[in-house]
Amino acid sequence: MVKNKNESAILRYDILVLKRRGVTRDLPSGTESLQWVTNTATLIYGEHDAVVVDTFATIDQNQQLVDWITKSGKNLTTIYITHAHGDHSFGIKILLDRFPNARAVAVPAVVKAMQTQIDPNYIKNFWNKLFPDQIPEALIVPEALESNELELEGHKLVVLDNGFTDTEYSTSLYVPSIGLVVAGDAVYNGIHPYMPETTEQSRLNWIAALDRIEGLKPHAVVAGHKNPANDDNSRYLCLS
């Protein structure tokens, strides 16, 4: 059967989950399960092209991400960053060096917030102390999106504005054609949420954001941080 040239290919997704030490290092004994965390990168792909959602913090993990995308055989067109935290965005330059025809994008508020994350003093006093000699030296911010949509082989990928979840200007990426939400840090799956930036009011906003995502009735929800043994069932919206 010959596919009509106007017929869109079915989209699929795959995830790369990598484990690292958490940023809280002064936990008491008996809390070993809280001393590590994972990050998730998601590859949404069609017949030829792909979009990756989020990167990692360290040089080694971002190189693993590059190798994983390369192995997929897909043409990477876009790197979408859900929010400003460095553990989701420090790999932009590494990916663009390997995939120079791709573009890195985020909503304007995230682009602005990332300027603080890549400030040399902040890198020196926070990230380099936690991960010495592991953070990329060349850190860049993505381009600002002019709309709330991306396109992949004829399918819309819709940006969801979550407001404040575990940090300000949190977003997710919704793929209506396959019922997928790549949630970023709006959703945690079997991992203790990062709470230091939150307040009582922001946590209420977080709950409201989860309710909005649940209202989309997604088939799959990919958490920004997840236990690798868990699936991507939407029930984790209620467990975040």
List each model region and its residues.
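Pre-active-site segment of Zn-dependent metallo-hydrolases
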Residues: 31-38, 48-78
